[in-house]
Amino acid sequence: MKDAIKFVKKCEKCQKHAPLIHQHSEPYHSVVSPWPFARWGLDIIGKLPLAKPGKCFVLLATDYFTNWVEAESYSSVTTNDVISFIWKFIICRFGLPNSLTMDNGTQFNNLKVEGFCEMYGIRVNYSPVYHPQANGMAEATNKAVVGNMRRNLEDKKGAWLEELPKVLWAQRTTKKRVTDESPFALVFGTEAILPTEAGLPTLTTLFAENVEENQR
């Protein structure tokens, strides 16, 4: 931990882009999810530097149980984009959620989104647009994703779109303090084999090799 603190103090990008906390601490109010993918928080990141082909916003969804993140880039985020995102990235991948938490932005808080969610029995919770702490997990994830983007893209400006998959990969495979597990492990039941482990023996690869040998 001491080495990490020293590194961060000497890291120019960390000092420049890491968020400064000016708020007084408040009691922590946990948002409990009864099972994986039952409750999601949705939020919009942007406006980011313009990336080809004209993308400058990211719609982000965070599962409250596993911390798993889904994201898509847009030139602008419309109500139809939100509905399509919920269908494509949440329902079609993880099944119907019990509830969605969003802020009061016009893309979220409207009759179209409410009607779509009502059709599938999804409860919608709205948090004040100027009090995103009420949607705490999504806001914390946004800070992590945007912070990583800024640190990684300081000199690349509009290249954040190419970096988004890497940032999401890091978010999904990094252990979280609350669960002491990575979102990947909670979703798939095993840790991901990272690119840095290519060619190295891991518990997963050793187990797979052992199974293959026993099947011969």
In which residue ranges do the predicted regions lie?
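Active-site beta-loop-alpha junctions of metal-dependent nucleic acid enzymes
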Residues: 72-92
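Amphipathic alpha-helical
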Residues: 1-38
